[in-house]
Regions:
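Extended alpha-helical solenoid/arm regions of large eukaryotic scaffolding proteins
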Residues: 1-327
C-alpha cells in the first residue's frame, strides 16, 4: 500500500493512513533516511493529516515516531502546526513543553518566540533547562512572564551579570524579596550606597553585620544611619543600636545621639565612647561618657576639648590619682 502511494505521489492519502494506523513500525519504515519520498510525506503529515485529527493517541504516536527517527527540525514543524495553529491540541501542556525543548535542542532562534506565544508549559522546569543550555535571556523571559520575579532577577544577576537591568527590573516589580536579592548582589560588588537603598526598599535588615562592615570600610556613614534606623525598627539588637550611635557620631548628629542615649536602648555606650575618643571625636565621646558616668574618661575628653574647669570637676568625681595626674 505504501509502495502504491509512493509510486503515484499519493502522499496526502499515505499521510492520513499512517496517522490513523498508529503503527510505530510503519512510521519507522517511512521515516528512514533512505526513503526518497520521506520529505514529501512529512510535508503532507504536517500540512494535512495531523491537523485533521482530533484523536490524542494519533497525535501521540506520530510525535513519538518523529522523536524516535531523530528528526528534531521536522518535529518542530509538526508541533508548530499542532500547537500554534489553533488546533484542538493547542493548549496541550506536554506538546507545548516538547515544542520548546525540541527548539532548545535543534533551533535556538525559535525558543524566544515560543516562550512568548505559548502559555501552558511547565515554566520553572523549562526555564532551568534553558539556563543549563546557556539560554539566559530566554530563562529570564519565562520567569518574568509567569511572575517568578525572584528567579528572574537571579538570572539577571548570576547569569546575565547586569546589575543595571536588575535594578530596573526591581523598580518595575517592586517586591521586597526582589530588592533583597539585588541588595546582596550590590553589596558583593562593593556598591554600598546602592545596596543600602535596596535593603531599605526591601525593609530587610537581615544582613546588618555585612552592611556595617562594608559601610565602615567605604565611609558610607550617612547611608549607614538610614539603614540602621530601619533595622532598629525591625529588631532591637544590641549590635544594631551600638553601631547606630557610632554612625550618628561619625555624621556629627550630636543632638540625635544625645536623644538616643537618653532613651531606652541596648547599646554598648562605653564601647562607642572609647571608639569616638580614639578617633578624636571628643564632643561625641563627652556625651557618651557623661551618659554612663565614666568620670575618668570624661575628664580626659574634657582636657582634649580645652574645658579645664569641667575636667577638674570630673577628675574630682573620678577620684583617681591617674586621672588627677592627667588633668
Amino acid at each position: 500500500l505504501l509502495q502504491v502511494c509512493n509510486e503515484n505521489s499519493l502522499f496526502k492519502s499515505e499521510a492520513r493512513y499512517l496517522v490513523r494506523r498508529k503503527d510505530p513500525e510503519l512510521w519507522a519504515n517511512v521515516l528512514e533516511e533512505n526513503n526518497p519520498f520521506r520529505r514529501q510525506l512529512i510535508d503532507q503529515v504536517v500540512q494535512t493529516a495531523l491537523s485533521e485529527t482530533q484523536d490524542p493517541e494519533e497525535v501521540s504516536v506520530t510525535v513519538k515516531a518523529f522523536m524516535t527517527a531523530d528528526l528534531p527540525n521536522e518535529l518542530i514543524e509538526l508541533l508548530e502546526k499542532i500547537v500554534l495553529d489553533n488546533s484542538v491540541f493547542s493548549e496541550h501542556r506536554n506538546l507545548q513543553n516538547l515544542l520548546i525543548l525540541t527548539a532548545i535542542k535543534a533551533d535556538r532562534t525559535r525558543v524566544m518566540e515560543y516562550i512568548n506565544r505559548l502559555d501552558n508549559y511547565d515554566a520553572p522546569d523549562i526555564a532551568n533547562i534553558a539556563i543549563s543550555n546557556e539560554l539566559y535571556e530566554e530563562a529570564f523571559a519565562i520567569f518574568r512572564k509567569f511572575d517568578v520575579n525572584t528567579s528572574a532577577i537571579q538570572v539577571l544577576i548570576e547569569h546575565i551579570g547586569n546589575l543595571d537591568r536588575a535594578y530596573e527590573f526591581a523598580e518595575r516589580c517592586n517586591e521586597p524579596p526582589v530588592w533583597s536579592q539585588l541588595a546582596r548582589a550590590q553589596l558583593q560588588k562593593d556598591l554600598v550606597k546602592e545596596a543600602i537603598d535596596s535593603y531599605i526598599k526591601a525593609d530587610d535588615p537581615s544582613a546588618y553585620m555585612e552592611v556595617v562592615q562594608a559601610a565602615n570600610k567605604n565611609d558610607n556613614w550617612e547611608d549607614l544611619v538610614k539603614f540602621l534606623q530601619m533595622a532598629r525598627k525591625k529588631a532591637r539588637e544590641s549590635y544594631v543600636e551600638t553601631e547606630l550611635i557610632f554612625a550618628l557620631a561619625k555624621t556629627n548628629r550630636l543632638s540625635e545621639l544625645e536623644e538616643f542615649v537618653s532613651g531606652p536602648n541596648n547599646a554598648h555606650i562605653q564601647q562607642v565612647g572609647d571608639r569616638c575618643y580614639e578617633e578624636g571625636m571628643y564632643e561625641a565621646a563627652k556625651l557618651l561618657y557623661n551618659n554612663v558616668s565614666n568620670f575618668a574618661r570624661l575628664a580626659s575628653t574634657l582636657v582634649h576639648l580645652g574645658e579645664y574647669q569641667a575636667a577638674v570637676d570630673s577628675g574630682r568625681k573620678a577620684n583617681s590619682t591617674r586621672t588627677w595626674k592627667e588633668v
